[in-house]
């Protein structure tokens, strides 16, 4: 999930319900229906249109894509200036993987090349990190520019602290993009950069207090960055999958893989410790102390991604889909948080992807919901509502739960829809249903 911005800086439901409840075994994939096929075509077209829009006249070379691009349609709230021209790393990683699923390797590599350059040539700290966001467009400079804007009235440069920070999950997703690209077309720079990103998380976010794992990353301006001391189930799942994949890739090339194997085990062990067997669901992670498990909240992605990624031992977790159905259902789709206040398009697409992986198909109602969110510019709205909440804070300076999604066309939502509709698993680089093991009923 990408965090958009700081508020301070600024009759089908039953069918879908039956599809989620009680899933215990993977089924052979069924043939996609007409809606799913159309959604695959249209979401892939939306991603290609995003590339064409943001590249300007540069038809080759590294490229970052804008995360939120208003369609200026009725029902869209006023756009937040802090998001104008911001290319969130998570959204771009997803878009690159989805472009691979759409058969557009050349466009996917342009995003991967931008990530490689960003890691090698950070604006101030070339230590192997990526920032949470960059300036969208062709990357023509040696050091990719960070987002921001000139405020003529104040006569000062305005930037966003979250956007220039480094969240652990975003680092892992950048690595997953490069691993998908390397698998599609072996490229030494992609694998080497993925290893460097994972090394950064080991050196900078490993936290052995409480349940051993990886904390949230680093937040703030370069001269005053501080650790995000909480640990996230989702972030650790991302690291576990990226590290395990990297270990396999370097081992295949005859290189030592012990570091990545250890990292994968550490992160996956953390995910396993967040499983609540009595409630049959995952906790979202820990509190700020990095040790106390946060038991109240529930994040949709934290429930779904372990099932889509399907690491060894994941059969014990399949019943979390019952929790999702009971506590994340919103209309024909699903919301971000427990007892949600609206549909989260991206998360609803994640549910579709998980159903395709675990059951071989997702319900028609869900595909139709996703299709209904297409904006005039080809991207898909982050939510059908004007605004939905997540129950989470953006950073340590937040005074409350200030992380929201708004009804703006969103690159990340579009990418997840493309992944779900094409049946492509971003955690493995393969067709989802062919990779997920069957589980005993």
PLM feature spans:
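Bacterial N-terminal signal peptides that target proteins for export
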Residues: 2-14
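Bacterial N-terminal signal peptides
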Residues: 12-22
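Low-complexity, Ser/Thr/Pro/Gly-enriched N-terminal "stalk/linker" regions
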Residues: 27-164, 169, 188-191, 195-225, ...
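Well-ordered alpha-helical scaffold segments within catalytic/enzyme domains
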Residues: 31-33, 91-107, 173-187, 238-255, ...
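Alpha-helical positions within canonical tetratricopeptide repeat
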Residues: 106-110, 189, 193, 256-259, ...
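Loop-centered beta-sheet repeat module
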Residues: 227-281
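Long, repeat-rich segments with strong aromatic
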Residues: 292-361
């Amino acid at each position: 999930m990408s965090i958009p911005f700081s508020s301070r800086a600024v009759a089908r439901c039953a069918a879908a319900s039956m599809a989620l409840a009680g899933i215990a075994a993977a089924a052979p994939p069924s043939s996609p229906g007409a809606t799913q096929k159309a959604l695959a075509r249209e979401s892939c077209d939306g991603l290609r249109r995003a590339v064409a829009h943001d590249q300007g006249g540069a038809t080759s070379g590294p490229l970052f894509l804008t995360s939120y691009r208003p369609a200026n349609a009725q029902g869209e709230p006023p756009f937040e200036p802090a998001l104008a021209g911001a290319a969130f790393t998570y959204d771009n990683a997803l878009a690159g993987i989805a472009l691979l699923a759409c058969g557009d390797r050349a466009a996917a590599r342009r995003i991967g090349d931008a990530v490689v350059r960003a890691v090698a040539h950070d604006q101030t700290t070339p230590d192997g990190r990526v920032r949470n966001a960059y300036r969208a467009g062709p990357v023509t400079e040696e050091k990719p520019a960070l987002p921001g804007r000139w405020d003529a009235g104040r006569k000062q440069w305005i930037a966003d602290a979250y956007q220039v920070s480094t969240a652990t999950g975003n680092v892992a997703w950048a690595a997953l993009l490069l691993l998908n690209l390397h698998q599609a077309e072996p490229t030494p720079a992609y694998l080497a950069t993925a290893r460097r990103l994972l090394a950064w998380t080991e050196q900078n976010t490993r936290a052995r207090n409480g349940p051993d794992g990886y904390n949230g990353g680093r937040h703030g301006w370069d001269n005053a960055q501080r650790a995000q001391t909480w640990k996230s189930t989702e972030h650790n799942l991302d690291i576990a999958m990226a590290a395990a994949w990297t270990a396999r890739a370097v081992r295949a090339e005859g290189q030592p893989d012990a570091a990545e194997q250890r990292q994968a085990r550490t992160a996956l062990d953390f995910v396993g410790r967040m499983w609540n067997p009595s409630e049959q669901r995952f906790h979202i992670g820990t509190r700020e102390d990095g040790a106390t498990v946060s038991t109240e909240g529930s994040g949709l992605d934290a429930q779904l991604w372990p099932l889509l990624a399907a690491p060894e031992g994941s059969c014990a977790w399949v019943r979390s889909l019952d929790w999702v159905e009971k506590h994340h259902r919103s209309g024909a789709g699903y919301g971000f948080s427990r007892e949600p206040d609206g549909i989260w398009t991206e998360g609803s697409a994640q549910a579709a992807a998980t159903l395709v992986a675990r059951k071989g198909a997702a319900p028609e109602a869900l595909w139709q919901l996703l299709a209904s969110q297409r904006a005039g510019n080809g991207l898909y709205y982050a939510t059908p509502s004007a605004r939905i909440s997540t129950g989470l804070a953006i950073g340590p300076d937040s005074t409350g739960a200030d992380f929201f999604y708004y009804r703006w066309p969103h690159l990340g939502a579009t990418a997840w829809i493309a992944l779900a509709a094409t049946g492509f698993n971003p955690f493995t680089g393969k067709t989802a249903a062919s990779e997920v093991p069957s589980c005993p009923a």
